Amino acid sequence: MTDLLSRAHADALDAADPLRSLRDAFVFPQHGDRDQTYLVGNSLGLQPRAARAMVDEVLDQWGTLGVEGHFTGPTQWLTYHQLVRDALARVVGAQPGEVVAMNTLSVNLHLMMASFYRPTHERGAILIEAGAFPSDRHAVESQLRLRGLDPATHLIEVEADEPNGTLSMAAIADAIAQHGPRLALVLWPGIQYRTGQAFDLAEIVRLARAQGAAVGCDLAHAVGNIPLTLHDDGVDFAVWCNYKYLNAGPGAVGGCFVHERHANSDLPRIAGWWGHEQQTRFRMDPQFVPSPGAEGWQLSNPPVLALAPLRASLALFDQTGMAALRAKSERLTGHLEQLIHARVPQVLQIVTPAEPMRRGCQLSLRVAGGRAQGCSLFEHLHAAGVLGDWREPDLIRIAPVPLYNRFSDLHTFVGQVEAWAAA
């Protein structure tokens, strides 16, 4: 009988994997004469092989047509951002008109808060999770100060209440209920970046809206990682980056969702010419007439060269579907969890929740012995060509991505942990 935790079994799982050929669609950094064991797609996804051809297509069109490339050629730049719209909508569970690729995450967060954070004398507080990604916290604090409000009184942080530093739904519900009459906005992640915990966004929306608060989401670690249903959940807005699980390259164009109930609203916004309705944009009229839906929040014409790699990656998502990717992801992360518990339980503590519905692909790991030991292991892994990432003060994050990671990669990782522990 095959040992279910053996490398031979992992190799058999890889051979039987219906998605195994997707790995060939990506370029892997090299370690000596082999591919790196790349388990850091939660920080930067790998380059799709098709990305180079799509970037070259834009360069060729620029060289051949010059400015006319905006209106002629195989991919007109006037509407290039719409080439990724439908696929992005499928990834996040939205209607096509509810999404747009533009700017970057933090810029989009400020744009959304300018419209959806509408403080009054009685209702001006913003609720976030304690330990939120620093850029989100910076954005929230600065928005409060721009409105003449003090973060000390108007920024409410929900503290972790579970042993590993994660948050129960009960704690979130209690905070929303306790502060409900003061809340103007609940800003919540799809997945918490340090712990890897996934949240029930539909329930958070239900609780917040019952109190009269708007709801926005940072989906940086959720988009392309777990299935999302933003339209059905009723989120007011969401923002994300496309360089992690959506593999659009370093500093890639971000994404934004605005629920269709706001499509033709008179919400105040920070406006720019590319958000003006397309049919009359080039009349250059002084009055701003927003495009319906999320596109009405655009400022400038999109960076076409930066959108090209996103097109390449989204084609793979359309080819495969989030359901199939999620099924493999649960198996990969579950296998990693089993290996850690069976082979290195005295070395690694898993911080991320064990329930599959409360996590994505990432496991956040704390090394026994404290920060110095964690740094030592991280450096050992890097030297061995096994890439995760480090998050202060003491976590190693490992993210097996179903598009390109294998079950055997997880054995390589655990084997290197064992080698370090035995040294």
Swiss-Prot record:
Associated pathway: Amino-acid degradation; L-kynurenine degradation; L-alanine and anthranilate from L-kynurenine: step 1/1; Cofactor biosynthesis; NAD(+) biosynthesis; quinolinate from L-kynurenine: step 2/3
Cellular component terms (Gene Ontology): cytoplasm
Residues that bear N6-(pyridoxal phosphate)lysine: 244
InterPro entries registered for this protein in UniProt: Kynureninase (IPR010111), PyrdxlP-dep_Trfase (IPR015424), PyrdxlP-dep_Trfase_major (IPR015421), PyrdxlP-dep_Trfase_small (IPR015422)
Top-level taxon of the source organism: Bacteria
Catalysed reactions, as listed in the record: L-kynurenine + H2O = anthranilate + L-alanine + H(+); 3-hydroxy-L-kynurenine + H2O = 3-hydroxyanthranilate + L-alanine + H(+)
Main enzyme class: hydrolase
Assigned EC number: 3.7.1.3
Required co-factors: pyridoxal 5'-phosphate
Function recorded in the entry: Catalyzes the cleavage of L-kynurenine (L-Kyn) and L-3-hydroxykynurenine (L-3OHKyn) into anthranilic acid (AA) and 3-hydroxyanthranilic acid (3-OHAA), respectively.
UniProt xrefs under HAMAP family: Kynureninase (MF_01970)
Protein name: Kynureninase
Record lineage: Bacteria, Pseudomonadati, Pseudomonadota, Gammaproteobacteria, Lysobacterales
The gene coding this protein: kynU
